[in-house]
Structures are given as structure tokens and as C-alpha cells.
């Protein structure tokens, strides 16, 4: 007991010294305003008991659109207005182009040798170029069209089977199953035996990657990391994910030798095929190895399965709450697919209202409410305030989408609001940034949207959807899961009645 007391006292003195050093430094720089801070933990107590993007929006109403927080030993700035977002993502984009270290990504992504979380530099530039030009190019996304159509047919068949037996359909579970199968086949060329386990593990990573673990707020105090639960869980998840993906890569390597002289276009191959070819590219500044491939695959699954399924589920929730929108969207898709025995993605191109539904869903339910955080590379002045080097910068895109200065009836689900405006997904409009903006904008935007449009269109075309008997739209639970994404917390059970023209 005495040894424990001595250890805790030493920890207290060590932290007190660091706190005094921080206080002295903060007094010499004009930091943005922020809520009051406590010794050691800084502003962390303000985030207790709520989802961070909601708590931070409320704090910003008092302290302003550029707000400073002290998250343990990490200095952080939260952006909550389009003007400030433009400063970070465009005007000073290069100064904020890097990523802070996060425990989850260090462990899961092989010391951040992926694309989404790697620090800004030549390696990131190389890997992003590969991603944009070969892995997730428009040509590659189109090449996956037959896989999407095939998986949509399987999705429709599974729901028809359940509805014919009188079962309630777990809409959320079915959509996750679709997006995971679609992503597996795009990445691996097939459905791995451990698909369900793999997706479960990836979703656990997303839950653990919020960035507020002890290791993330006290990164230099290694002795404190033993008190965090996340590290043990992440190491266990990493071990299992690594084994699954390693097996898939080795299987592809065996088959790759027999196909190395096959001159297929890159867009027609799966992700691992593309990366294995590049592994032999001697012109690359940074040679690709197994860890690079595994890290990029994890990126694709974390983004491809979670964000797409989250958006599709929230779109259905909002349409059930707004029957007028549901009826209008169904009328459009049923007219587009009328008298067609088969379908393809060309039919989706003309579904203008459905696209507005997805766009409005992302306004209210940004897939990643606090964009993947950036890190300041160079001391920068914004709006008269100093942003020091190594500051963690969070852009609250969830709050941007609900800013009453830019949006009318912010809490209302109105797809029509986008009919006569030029707002797009590519980061040009700073009040609407579901995929981010600037150099670190999500490179998989086209892939993600394709995985939203087609399945939602077919689900609306083939079924009439109702809430279970006795349940009203007002009873729908809008609670979000903890973690980096904003997925709905509860399953969504619905009655699916096959549509008879």
C-alpha cells in the first residue's frame, strides 16, 4: 500500500510540473478562447456524459467558432463555422495537412502506414496518388458495378425470404451485411470465410478510435497507458485482423504468379491484385510491403462499410419520420425501374430526388461528425489567434450542417433544400463537408456514394416499409453510438412488404 502511495505521489509531482510548463507557454501565446480548465485533465471534464460533436457544438455557442481545449497534455482547437473551416481546410491547408498520433491507428494501421491516418509527407503523397489513380479511381469504382448489382440482388432475396415468413427485417443488419460483402469482394475478389468476424473487428476499431483514450490525451506518459482499457482491446483486435488479412494476401500471392502475365486493366482487378502488382514496381520511392497492403485494406473497410451503411440507415430512419419524402422517393425509383427485369447503375443516374435524400441525410447525420483530426505543422494565425505547432484540430462538420446562419429549419429533413443550389460533396462548400475538404479530403467519395445509391433505390423499389405494429415515427430512437462514426445505436426493425405493381 505504501509503495502505491509513493508511486501516485511521484505521478502527481510529474504531472504538476508538466501542467506548470503548459500554463507558462499558454500565457505567452494568444490562443483561441475556450472553457475553463482543470489541472492535469484540462478541458476533459466538459466532454463527460455526451457525444463529443454535440457537446462541442454547445460549447462553441458560448466560446466561438474557433475554440481552444486542453485535452490532457494535448492542445486542441475545435472549428465550428464555415468561415473557420475554410481557414483550416483551404487558406492554411498545408499547415494543417498532417495527422496527430492516435493509439488506435498506431496499433491497427501498422504505425500509420495507411493513407487516412499517415502523417503528411512524401509517403502519404505516394500512397494517396496510388489510391486516387488506381485503387479508387472513377474507372475502378465503375468496374465494381457488377459486384454491387450482384450483392443488391442477394440483399433483396434475403429480405423477401424474411418477409414471406412474417419476420421483422433488421434493416440496419441487412445494410451492414450488404456493404461489408460489397467491400470484401472489391478488396479481396471473394467473400472470406471469416467475413462476419472481420467486419465485427473493424467496427470495434471504429468504436475505439474516438481519440479520447488515456493514451491519446497523455501520449508522452507511457506509464499511464496501463490504465486505459483501449490498448489491450486494440492489440487483441489487431492480432485477429492481421491473421485474417495475411491469409488472404498469401492466397492471392499464390494465385498471382499464374496471372502475372495477364494484361487485365487495373480497374478490373480487386484491391489486393492492384497492390500486389505495385509491390513489384521498382520506381516507387517507398516500396510497398504486406503491412502497407493490410493498412490500406483496413482503411477501405473502416470507411467503406461504416460510412455507407450509416448513411443508408439514417436515410431510411428520416424517411420513416417523413412519409411524404418516402412516398416521393419510392415513386421516383419505381418509375425509373418500371417494366425492367434487370437493372444496372446507369438507371440510378437519373434518380435526382433519391440523390437529394442522400445529400440531406449527410447534412443531418455526417458519417464522421468530427472529421478525422488534423495536426498543425507550422505555427499559424487564424482570426487573430495563434495555433501552435502540434495542435490537434477538429472540424465539427455535424455542427456545420446544422448552422442556422446557413440552413433554414436546420432540424427538418427537407431534401428539396438542395434542388436549386450548387452544393456538392467535394469540399467546395464549407457549410457542407461530409467527406472533408482540402488535401486530406476522403479519396473514396465515389465508392461510398455508389454503395448508398443503388441499394437504397432497390430497397425502395421492391418493398413497402413500415414500422412494427404499435410503433410511431416519434418512437424512433436517434441515439448515436460512441466512436468515430455517427452510426445509430439501436437496430432498426421494420415490416417489409414486397411491392406488387
Swiss-Prot record:
A Pfam family that this protein carries is p450
Q: Which domain of life is it from?
A: Eukaryota
GO molecular function terms noted in the UniProt entry: heme binding; iron ion binding; monooxygenase activity; oxidoreductase activity, acting on paired donors, with incorporation or reduction of molecular oxygen
Q: What are the UniProt keywords, alphabetically?
A: Heme, Iron, Metal-binding, Monooxygenase, Oxidoreductase
Top EC class for this record: oxidoreductase
The record's listing under PROSITE patterns reads: CYTOCHROME_P450
Which EC number(s) does the record attach to this protein? 1.14.-.-
Question: Which InterPro entries does the UniProt entry name for this protein?
Answer: CYP450_71D, Cyt_P450, Cyt_P450_CS, Cyt_P450_E_grp-I, Cyt_P450_sf
The prosthetic group or cofactor this protein requires is:
heme
- Sites where the protein binds heme: 442
Q: Which family does it belong to?
A: Belongs to the cytochrome P450 family.
Q: What is this protein called?
A: Cytochrome P450 71D6
Originating species: Solanum chacoense
Amino acid at each position: 500500500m505504501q509503495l502505491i502511495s509513493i508511486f501516485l505521489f511521484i505521478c502527481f509531482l510529474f504531472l504538476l510540473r508538466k501542467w506548470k510548463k503548459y500554463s507558462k507557454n499558454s500565457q505567452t501565446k494568444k490562443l483561441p478562447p475556450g472553457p475553463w480548465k482543470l489541472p492535469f485533465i484540462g478541458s476533459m471534464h466538459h466532454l463527460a456524459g455526451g457525444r463529443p460533436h454535440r457537446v462541442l457544438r454547445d460549447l462553441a455557442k458560448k466560446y466561438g467558432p474557433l475554440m481552444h481545449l486542453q485535452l490532457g497534455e494535448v492542445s486542441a482547437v475545435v472549428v465550428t463555422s464555415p468561415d473557420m473551416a475554410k481557414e483550416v481546410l483551404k487558406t492554411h491547408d498545408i499547415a494543417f495537412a498532417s495527422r496527430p498520433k492516435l493509439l488506435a491507428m498506431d496499433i491497427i494501421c501498422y504505425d500509420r502506414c495507411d493513407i487516412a491516418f499517415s502523417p503528411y509527407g512524401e509517403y502519404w503523397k505516394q500512397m494517396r496518388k496510388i489510391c486516387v489513380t488506381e485503387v479508387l479511381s472513377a474507372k475502378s469504382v465503375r468496374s465494381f458495378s457488377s459486384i454491387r448489382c450482384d450483392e443488391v440482388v442477394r440483399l433483396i432475396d434475403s429480405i423477401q425470404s424474411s418477409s414471406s415468413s412474417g419476420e421483422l427485417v433488421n434493416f440496419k443488419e441487412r445494410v451492414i451485411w450488404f456493404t461489408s460483402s460489397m467491400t470484401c469482394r472489391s478488396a479481396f475478389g471473394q467473400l472470406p470465410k471469416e467475413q462476419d468476424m472481420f467486419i465485427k473487428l473493424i467496427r470495434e476499431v471504429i468504436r475505439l478510435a474516438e481519440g479520447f483514450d488515456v493514451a491519446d490525451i497523455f501520449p508522452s506518459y507511457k506509464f499511464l497507458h496501463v490504465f486505459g482499457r483501449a490498448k489491450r482491446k486494440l492489440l487483441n483486435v489487431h492480432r485477429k485482423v492481421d491473421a485474417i488479412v495475411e491469409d488472404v494476401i498469401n492466397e492471392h500471392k499464390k494465385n498471382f504468379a499464374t496471372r502475372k502475365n495477364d494484361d487485365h486493366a487495373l480497374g478490373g482487378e480487386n484491391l489486393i491484385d492492384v497492390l500486389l502488382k505495385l509491390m513489384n514496381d521498382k520506381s516507387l520511392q517507398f516500396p510497398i510491403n504486406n503491412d502497407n497492403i493490410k493498412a490500406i485494406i483496413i482503411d477501405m473497410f473502416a470507411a467503406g462499410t461504416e460510412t455507407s451503411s450509416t448513411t443508408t440507415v439514417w436515410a431510411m430512419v428520416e424517411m420513416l419520420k417523413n412519409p411524404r419524402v418516402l412516398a416521393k422517393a419510392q415513386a421516383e425509383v419505381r418509375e425509373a425501374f418500371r417494366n425492367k427485369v434487370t437493372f444496372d447503375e446507369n438507371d440510378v443516374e437519373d434518380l435526382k430526388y433519391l440523390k437529394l435524400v442522400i445529400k440531406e441525410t449527410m447534412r443531418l447525420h455526417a458519417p464522421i461528425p468530427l472529421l478525422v483530426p488534423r495536426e498543425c505543422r507550422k505555427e499559424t494565425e487564424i482570426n487573430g489567434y495563434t495555433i501552435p505547432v502540434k495542435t490537434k484540430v477538429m472540424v465539427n462538420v455535424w455542427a456545420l450542417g446544422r448552422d442556422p446562419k446557413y440552413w433554414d429549419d436546420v432540424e427538418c429533413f427537407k431534401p428539396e433544400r438542395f434542388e436549386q443550389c450548387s452544393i456538392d460533396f467535394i469540399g467546395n462548400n464549407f457549410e457542407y463537408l461530409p467527406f472533408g475538404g482540402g488535401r486530406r479530403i476522403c479519396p473514396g467519395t465515389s465508392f461510398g456514394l455508389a454503395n448508398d445509391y443503388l441499394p437504397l433505390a432497390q430497397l425502395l423499389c421492391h418493398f413497402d416499409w413500415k414500422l412494427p405494429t404499435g410503433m410511431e415515427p416519434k418512437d424512433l430512437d436517434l441515439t448515436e453510438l460512441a466512436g468515430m462514426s455517427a452510426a445509430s445505436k439501436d437496430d432498426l426493425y421494420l415490416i417489409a412488404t414486397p411491392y406488387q405493381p
